[in-house]
Amino acid sequence: GGGARSGDDVVAKYCNACHGTGLLNAPKVGDSAAWKTRADAKGGLDGLLAQSLSGLNAMPPKGTCADCSDDELKAAIGKMSGL
């Protein structure tokens, strides 16, 4: 591997298909209010990470990035949410 991918790289390759458009009620990239509501309900950024690891509704585990590390996913969530 080429080392850790940045949050931007992960978002662009794996997250944007749904989170870029709000497909299937996914919180949109940059919609900090929608992300904050979810983060507050789930225990912050770590809670959102835990949800992403297990999958949620239409989102598969790790949101299609099966080989992403927890740190890469957390960076991507941070980029999308602004949290």
Swiss-Prot record:
Keywords: Disulfide bond, Electron transport, Heme, Iron, Metal-binding, Transport. Binds 1 heme c group covalently per subunit. Gene3D superfamilies: Cytochrome c-like domain. Heme c binds at C15, C18, H19, M59. SUPFAM superfamilies: Cytochrome c. GO terms for molecular function: electron transfer activity; heme binding; iron ion binding. Disulfide bonds join C65-C68. Homodimer. It is unreactive with cytochrome c reductase or oxidase. Belongs to the cytochrome c family. This is Cytochrome c5. It comes from Azotobacter vinelandii. The lineage of its organism: Bacteria, Pseudomonadati, Pseudomonadota, Gammaproteobacteria, Pseudomonadales.
